[in-house]
């Protein structure tokens, strides 16, 4: 896992790119993570990249987090972290684009079968079966909330209780209380089941 002292690196900011498909919640995952960072006392920026807005189309969302005011307003081309919400995207697009070998990738994957698709990436890779967890807890393949649990596992600056509070805020007008609780359960399960790929 990444120690709190190393989170922002030399540039003083953590830049995260979420890659998913329409309907998987990449945009809301970015928004919730930004809320978590803000509630934790950090400066934030969060913005989606709009493309074809249809279910199944690739979707990107970006978050910048820093312990000092963020003065840049450019798009994120060289993220520190890439979060992939659909493993099949490793077969159709370059999910490592702009990610250096010092970077981190977090994948929604059942096992390590994705490795040959991204063998050019030499950084740290973490994975969790976010889709399986979502299906088991909320009954639908919407892996965005389990992925937040994986991010908390990799980056201890993001606390589970703060993530759950942010989810409650985000979903209280959209989901039933029962479904919100199931999403919180999904976050916790993913936190405990996230694994690092061993080279």
Report residues per predicted region.
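Active-site cofactor/cluster-binding pocket
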Residues: 1-199
